[in-house]
From Swiss-Prot:
Belongs to the influenza viruses nucleoprotein family. Keywords: Capsid protein, Helical capsid protein, Host nucleus, Host-virus interaction, Ribonucleoprotein, RNA-binding, Viral nucleoprotein, Viral penetration into host nucleus, Virion, Virus entry into host cell. One of its GO terms (cellular component) is ribonucleoprotein complex. Late in virus-infected cells, may be cleaved from a 56-kDa protein to a 53-kDa protein by a cellular caspase. This cleavage might be a marker for the onset of apoptosis in infected cells or have a specific function in virus host interaction. The gene is NP. This is Nucleoprotein. Encapsidates the negative strand viral RNA, protecting it from nucleases. The encapsidated genomic RNA is termed the ribonucleoprotein (RNP) and serves as template for transcription and replication. The RNP needs to be localized in the host nucleus to start an infectious cycle, but is too large to diffuse through the nuclear pore complex. NP comprises at least 2 nuclear localization signals that are responsible for the active RNP import into the nucleus through cellular importin alpha/beta pathway.
Length: 498
């Protein structure tokens, strides 16, 4: 990992740029989302969508998925080499919903991938605009994080369902680049590494030959990404051990699971970006907003502003609560699935409830669902305040190694203290401190035992009025500390299935 001095900001990762100053970053991020908006408008024209249909989030998701699939080179190549029945490798499509005679109809559309690529490039000054594609992937990933639970995936890799707050970005595709790596949680990286090690255990040729050499490079790169997320020397030293292992096996899996648990108190730094559905950028471009001239940021007031004045609709199933559907999408837009509910509620200005209490299923509609009974409603995506997105993991007063916030991975840089029962977490650390990482394990456990739950995170950081775009007057909210702030509490969400 490069030293602090050479770190690029997320926006630079997002736009593939080298070091730029704030104005250049704002301009290149603006160019990126403006391109998404122009592409969306063009697709609505191609598909002859009405204004209302173009604002339907389900249509937005279908169009986003089409362009992501059109540019998925590895999969396209695979599909051409392994033709499967009824799948044309050169075409992409999905459900488009249209309003006909007071009812919603589903229409399955099919397009040439080449045509989609042409429209996308045309909207992006003739470039491939990979950054815009990654941006869409992160929006889909944030939506998945808010919608589904990953208990099954956690258990399969030998991790504990209580580590769900470490799983940000667990559904991001591998090709999501540096911007994707920045938003992945510690648990996500650990899970990817464990899967890799397990394949190596079961398949003797996994690390061998020319392919094995590439695999090894990928393994070490993933280790370095994970190492860069940890903020204490002992955790990083343990990652060096895992990376340098001659022949990764169960000892490494054990070390990684230990590190994932330790991240519940000694939080990793994980980026948060507000990525909005393509239709929102489309609405702004259509209303004459010049993104490149105005500039745009994924971590400031801009996304709150966008949502403040765009009207997006969603299909609603018969027994779903539209307010709950709105909460789901609001959380996805702000990458707040792992944020403390009390902080989210304060910013949003309406109570944000845990997932177990939501009467809503996912945003996407399965192809076998009955459209006869479908209704649509406006998503309420506005907020009362705005706050800066963080990447620090919520460690208190800049001590790199203090308690982050348990069972949440903070999204907003807003002062709060940390309701956590250290006993519950320390119970996960019974037993094994021997082996070659024993001294590091002992040190990590000692740091965790010394973490004080009464410490305050993000000291002095607050939320801002929407009129305060320069963030001059922070309002530091006071929270009722008695209740647990995790969104996953009493969870009954569906599992994420590819």
């Amino acid at each position: 990992m490069a030293s602090q001095g050479t770190k690029r900001s997320y926006e630079q990762m997002e736009t593939g740029g080298e070091r730029q100053n704030a104005t250049e970053i704002r301009a290149s991020v603006g160019r990126m989302v403006g391109g998404i908006g122009r592409f969306y408008i063009q697709m609505c024209t191609e598909l002859k969508l009405s204004d209302y249909e173009g604002r339907l989030i389900q249509n937005s998701i279908t169009i986003e998925r089409m362009v992501l699939s059109a540019f998925d080179e590895r999969r396209n190549k695979y599909l051409e080499e392994h033709p499967s029945a009824g799948k044309d490798p050169k075409k992409t499509g999905g459900p488009i919903y249209r309003r006909r005679d007071g009812k919603w109809m589903r229409e399955l559309i099919l397009y040439d991938k080449e045509e989609i690529r042409r429209i996308w490039r045309q909207a992006n000054n003739g470039e491939d605009a990979t950054a815009g594609l990654t941006h869409l992937m992160i929006w889909h990933s944030n939506l998945n994080d808010a919608t589904y639970q990953r208990t099954r995936a956690l258990v399969r890799t030998g991790m504990d369902p209580r580590m769900c707050s470490l799983m940000q970005g667990s559904t991001l595709p591998r090709r999501s680049g540096a911007a994707g790596a920045a938003v992945k949680g510690v648990g996500t990286m650990v899970m990817e590494l464990i899967r890799m090690i397990k394949r190596g255990i079961n398949d003797r040729n996994f690390w061998r030959g020319e392919n094995g050499r590439r695999t090894r490079i990928a393994y070490e790169r993933m280790c370095n990404i994970l190492k860069g997320k940890f903020q204490t020397a002992a955790q990083r030293a343990m990652m060096d051990q895992v990376r340098e292992s001659r022949n990764p096996g169960n000892a490494e899996v054990e070390d990684l699971i230990f590190l994932a648990r330790s991240a519940l108190i000694l939080r990793g730094s994980v980026a948060h970006k507000s990525c909005l559905p393509a239709c929102v950028y489309g609405l702004a471009v259509a209303s004459g907003y010049d993104f490149e001239r105005e500039g745009y940021s994924l971590v400031g007031i801009d996304s709150f502003r966008m949502l403040q004045n765009s009207q997006v609709f969603s299909l609603i199933r018969p027994n779903e609560n539209p307010a709950h559907k709105s909460q789901l999408v609001w959380m996805a837009c702000h990458s707040a699935a792992f944020e403390d509910l009390r902080v989210s509620s304060f910013i949003r200005g309406t109570r944000v409830v845990p997932r177990g209490q939501l009467s809503t299923r996912g945003v996407q509609i399965a192809s076998n669902e009955n459209m006869e009974t479908m209704d649509s409603s406006t998503l309420e995506l506005r907020s009362r305040y705005w706050a800066i997105r963080t990447r620090s993991g919520g460690n208190t007063n800049q001590q790199r190694a203090s308690a982050g916030q348990i069972s949440v991975q903070p999204t907003f840089s807003v002062q709060r203290n940390l309701p956590f029962e250290r006993a519950t977490i320390m119970a996960a650390f019974t037993g094994n401190t021997e082996g070659r990482t024993s001294d590091m394990r002992t040190e990590i456990i000692k740091m965790m035992e010394n973490a004080r739950p009464e410490d305050v995170s993000f000291q002095g950081r607050g939320v801002f009025e929407l009129s305060d775009e320069k963030a001059t007057n922070p309002i530091v909210p006071s929270f009722d500390m008695s209740n647990e702030g995790s969104y996953f509490f009493g969870d009954n969400a569906e599992e994420y299935d590819n």
